[in-house]
Amino acid sequence: MKDYVGAHMSIAGGIHNAPERGVKAGCGVIQLFTQNTNQWRGKLISDPDILLFKEKLAESGLNEVISHDIYLINLASAPGEIRDKSLNGFQEEMIRCSRLGIGKIVMHPGSHNGDGEEVGLRRIIEAFDYLIAETPAYSGKILLETTAGQGTNLGYTFEHLRTIIEGSAHPDRFGVCYDTCHTFAAGYDITSAAAYGQVWEEFDRIIGLDRLQCFHFNDSKKGLNCRIDRHEHIGKGAIGATAFSLIMNDPRFAGIPKILETPKGDNNEMDEINLKLLRDMVKQR
């Protein structure tokens, strides 16, 4: 059976290093940034480096690689410099992923910055309609990540994500990345079997389980509905181990990537520890 548990990996020294780092940590899948996250414009990845990445990925045996866009991008921003840079930045991400052979990009929907949720959501829809139409090179999925709802961030309700998907001229191009910390902080409780069942019934009714393409596995330093995004090691936070065990043993999610974004530790040892903890939760059938 293929393994779909993994973690976010650094691309320090070149993007081709990420697959090997993932294997060393014990990953079956990895997530990565395709560029420096503190810069609007990424360094051009040369054709030889693209080829090297693909060779290293093939050698690694990893089952999937997922990209995460840079945090500077805000597709809900008002017309102006930030919106222009966001559109250019996301288009560059789409093109890089096309060249790398990466078929899923995780992204935070954006912040309306006081202009209101309806306005912000409309801007996101318009941005994606433009990006998808103008970037035919990328044929993969865009995964809208659930958010904690800090400040004016959008995406903290399932309804927000549905609005973006259904409002788009290209609804088939979207999936969802369910971040356990973010959704818990936004008020979605999966800490007991009963609550877990209710949340997934709601997700299926509003968005559809077929849209779920990825998990970000993070416990939360803060409590339910706190609207604060603070990641903690698996089982060490306010969510607790039960929720992660429920997901790990849910046959509906067996083939969906589950990506750790928890603290790495002084020597990157914590990914291996958290991955083992998750795999040990799986009950033998």
UniProtKB/Swiss-Prot annotation:
It comes from Geotalea daltonii (strain DSM 22248 / JCM 15807 / FRC-32) (Geobacter daltonii). Binds 3 Zn(2+) ions. This is Probable endonuclease 4. Endonuclease IV plays a role in DNA repair. It cleaves phosphodiester bonds at apurinic or apyrimidinic (AP) sites, generating a 3'-hydroxyl group and a 5'-terminal sugar phosphate. SMART domains: AP2Ec (SM00518). NCBIfam families: nfo. PROSITE patterns: AP_NUCLEASE_F2_1, AP_NUCLEASE_F2_2, AP_NUCLEASE_F2_3, AP_NUCLEASE_F2_4. It catalyses: Endonucleolytic cleavage to 5'-phosphooligonucleotide end-products. Zn(2+) 2 binds at residues 145, 179, 216, 261. Its cofactor is Zn(2+). Zn(2+) 3 binds at residues 182, 229, 231. Its EC number is 3.1.21.2. One of its GO terms (molecular function) is deoxyribonuclease IV (phage-T4-induced) activity.
